[in-house]
């Protein structure tokens, strides 16, 4: 009854307020991915202004946290933190603290110091480090090498050779920042997406948003459709940034223990309260394996997930109802 009433109210609003508009915008090239914003606005001008504000915020976050921009705050940290404590902005400090918390919760499966080896990969040019190069750089991977001083608001590295990359969490953070901007403008129905990371507020025309999870090998095939309202969702897959060589796939999600591409799942979709959280936790299944990851997500309590194993088996957390015929954890 409550859902029916909500739908009738939404339809009534559509019929009565001819000024209200549903707006959509897609922008490429921000944070190295595609950004999409959808929202229900009181009028077209205010809606477009809100979208522009979100895109500007995405560019700002990228300018701070990109490792591809030598002048970014994160690049400065990587250049100096092995030698001296580096004072950083509250935003970067808090995100680093969050990332380290995820590392502790996942027992190191999520680790931003993967970049100590990861920087040697170039997936566009099909470049990978040799085993010798990996072994030489591997001691730099350990989240405990990243030392934060909250009172001084500094970060330093415990040893030379440490590099960090926030690629596993920064897009989710940018999505959350975009949503905060929209909510600050009074927008109650919207979606912000950066690559595989999305956050949803409210509904879409009185109905839940329907999010499809693609098959790892067949991009036009959907393995599950999930109705969402007021949730974040992140999907990570070994089909995003990769190259194949001699029958082996090298992709961007690395196992911190080996410096090699993690291969225990093909795809991980995580649903939770914020995109920062789902972005970070979606990577961990590749390292932990599907069964251990499901156990972790259910223990956390605010996370649901759909995982695709290498053999095609699909596992779900208990909070999700799997499609008929699917194999469930």
Question: Where are these predicted regions, by residue range?
Answer:
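Mature catalytic core of soluble alpha/beta enzymes
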Residues: 2-6, 16-329
